[in-house]
């Protein structure tokens, strides 16, 4: 996940105070000259280095619990860019306002920090080990959940460092440090017997000194009376620059001989499973539509946010090779239990809750039961599409498990029991932060990018057809109007108009009955509008023909009050009149990802704290 300040030309990354001062000297030392750099003490924090009266001033910027950023005693801001913008207009306690950015020289990129260099590999290892994922499922999980996973692993990054020795006594540490050259500043770090404490062992003057590292009540690490740090690796990096209470600064690593093995199989943090309810009986149905994980002990405050990979519908039920042996389009009726619980109904018939019995497990399913009297042509069309849908496999679409021909034609789908997106959001403006909305829309974009890659046009993308598994996991559903394109086709022409959702349709769909992935992009823009308006109806009080005239006049729906300008800009691009000028879903997903990551990097606290961060940004 990129650093929230990475795009700023005056951000230098992980450089020392001395290096910052050297850059400011070379830039002329004018009053108000400034740059921004990573803070070595505070995870996600920065330091503002400023010149005034030919002197250097350095102000730590802490990331607050609610995801905002503030200089001690100063106002909170939703990002480092916004903070610098504020202080360029009002010094508010600084010796002067920020007048001139000390931009990086051409070709100089921000210096990556220690964790920056390890982040991608650690995220990949964590996701692979925790959820046993491989292939596309692994890649999808990394993309969608990188912000959350990074927060989990940042505090364990020290276990990847060559100076960390995970099982070493005091005597063994001394033997290691005395072996070979006894250079001043040679060091290693090891855990102590007392839980949560560590020892820093350091050579100086041919003698080994041991320093206690403990955690305070806030979880910060420090040597007694020393500077406090969020992580052990930050403490070590800082002590490489200055002794700060040590007899000598850290200089030469005493490497762990098994460091390479640790890199290959790191000790990553245990995943905090989000489910605490009793384990599900296989003969009962869950109202929330997925199978909970086994119970675990949890305190009232220990409620980490759920991740899609924690649910039973992230991977295909056929991801197990044993189950894959039985994968067929047509399902046996005796393996399908249809409950009396009706989830919905429509022109086609009804949707019922059920359970499908597989070789090794039972899964909750939603069953579309076609009403009696459905025309043969419609059944044939549905079967053709079912054959294609049966091959689709992505965590962010509702998978077709199979078709059952018995008392009626039944389509057996994955269960996503959280209801449609627009109903979930309606009236919850105060409860659901913008970052949560962006997270769900990013998942929809990932699902649509997959369909685009498979030459599959949805034709009915709308908030009503985005179903939730939980508040952090969405799936695209209702492929009733979907159509697969041939490999050489970019669009196809519908035979008849039928009952079309005109308010979600692109102009070429209405005018010429031409559908493509770019017309789905238009619908995605309308879905975005629904989501950021918290479930409001698009083109309120307008009828279909009025909407078409409205669009022909070059008009578009206004930006919803809660919608960030970056997201309305993407919406507007989705609503470009000429289909060939609209972005594809590859582009849409990348833009959604970048924006969601930028929000996720700010919002560290629980939902109520996150809303404070949103308010600070507003």
Curated annotation (Swiss-Prot):
Main location: cytoplasm
Subunit structure: Interacts with CD247/CD3Z; this interaction docks ZAP70 at the stimulated TCR. Interacts with NFAM1. Interacts with adapter protein SLA; this interaction negatively regulates T-cell receptor signaling. Interacts with VAV1. Interacts with CBL; this interaction promotes ubiquitination, internalization and subsequent degradation of CD247/CD3Z. Identified in a complex with CBL and UBE2L3. Interacts with SHB. Interacts with adapter protein SLA2; this interaction negatively regulates T-cell receptor signaling. Interacts with CBLB.
Domain SH2: 10-102, 163-254
Phenotype upon gene inactivation: Mice lack both CD4 and CD8 positive mature T-lymphocytes. Displays a complete block in B-Cell development at the pro-B cell stage in the absence of both SYK and ZAP70.
Regulation of its activity: Activated by phosphorylation at Tyr-492 in the activation loop.
Matching SMART domains: SH2 (SM00252), TyrKc (SM00219)
Post-translational modification as stated in the protein's UniProt record: Phosphorylated on tyrosine residues upon T-cell antigen receptor (TCR) stimulation. Phosphorylation of Tyr-314 and Tyr-314 are essential for ZAP70 positive function on T-lymphocyte activation whereas Tyr-290 has a negative regulatory role. Within the C-terminal kinase domain, Tyr-491 and Tyr-492 are phosphorylated after TCR induction, Tyr-491 playing a negative regulatory role and Tyr-492 a positive. Tyr-492 is dephosphorylated by PTN22. Ubiquitinated in response to T cell activation. Deubiquitinated by OTUD7B.
EC numbers for this chain: 2.7.10.2
UniProt note: domains: Composed of 2 N-terminal SH2 domains and a C-terminal kinase domain. The tandem SH2 domains bind to the doubly phosphorylated tyrosine-based activation motif (ITAM) of CD247/CD3Z and the non-canonical phosphorylated tyrosine-based activation motif (TAM) of RHOH. The interdomain B located between the second SH2 and the kinase domain has been implicated in binding to other signaling molecules including CBL or VAV1. Thus, ZAP70 can also function as a scaffold by recruiting additional factors to the stimulated TCR complex.
Catalytic activity: L-tyrosyl-[protein] + ATP = O-phospho-L-tyrosyl-[protein] + ADP + H(+)
Keywords: Adaptive immunity, ATP-binding, Cell membrane, Cytoplasm, Immunity, Isopeptide bond, Kinase, Membrane, Nucleotide-binding, Phosphoprotein, Repeat, SH2 domain, Transferase, Tyrosine-protein kinase, Ubl conjugation
Modified residues (Phosphotyrosine): 248, 290, 314, 318, 491-492
Boundaries of every Protein kinase domain copy: 337-597
Name used for this protein in its record: Tyrosine-protein kinase ZAP-70
Lineage, broadest ranks: Eukaryota, Metazoa, Chordata, Craniata, Vertebrata
